[in-house]
Amino acid sequence: MDGFASIWPSSRSQVDGQSIGDAWVCSSLPTSPPAQLWESIVPFHKLTQWLCYSIMVPMSKLMNIHFAGSDLLTGLPEYRNGGLLIDMGLLTLKEDDLQRGLNAFKENAQIRGQPNVEVVPLFSAEDDVIVEWRAITVGFLDELVDEVNGQLGLLGEDQLTLAQMLEAGSWKVGSLADNQLRCWFDSILICLFLFRAVVKLQRSPDQTQKNHRL
């Protein structure tokens, strides 16, 4: 990961003066001091891991390359996987966080040029709500792949890998659920201040400060 340090914004989380990219402080974790600084940071690196998942299969099959530690890659905490947990009712916002997000959305809606969409809770990428949502998504994806393999009766080498479950399962179903539950293309369940290094976003040419789903 050291090779990516130069492209990660210096305004994000840092350890020993080094930018660490898609990794965010969470107040639920031990604080520094007495804990070490890194103990309060949740690492995601969604896009980096997505890239790894994408190139590993062809490189393994066509070039016979072995990737050590590939089992340490995690589920991807993005809006199709995380949104599925919300759309299926597994996760809900706490009432005080919901109200805080709605208030933030209404305040932001007063900015000229914002799109006219339904009122939904709005948070910045570093907000504990978003960090915890993404972290919980990673954890539940591990549980989900085990459950899917169990329900399908798959054992040993026949078991689906996490990457296979993500591509054909949670990511696919999350995308379908999103399309079916929301009646128009840009409809959203939770709004996120624009951070291009965190999520892949849809953006019109005249946007200056827009908000998008995780």
PLM feature spans:
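Extended, well-ordered protein cores
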Residues: 1-64, 68-97, 120-214
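Long, intrinsically disordered, low-complexity Ser/Thr/Pro-rich regulatory/activation regions
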Residues: 97-117, 121-122, 126
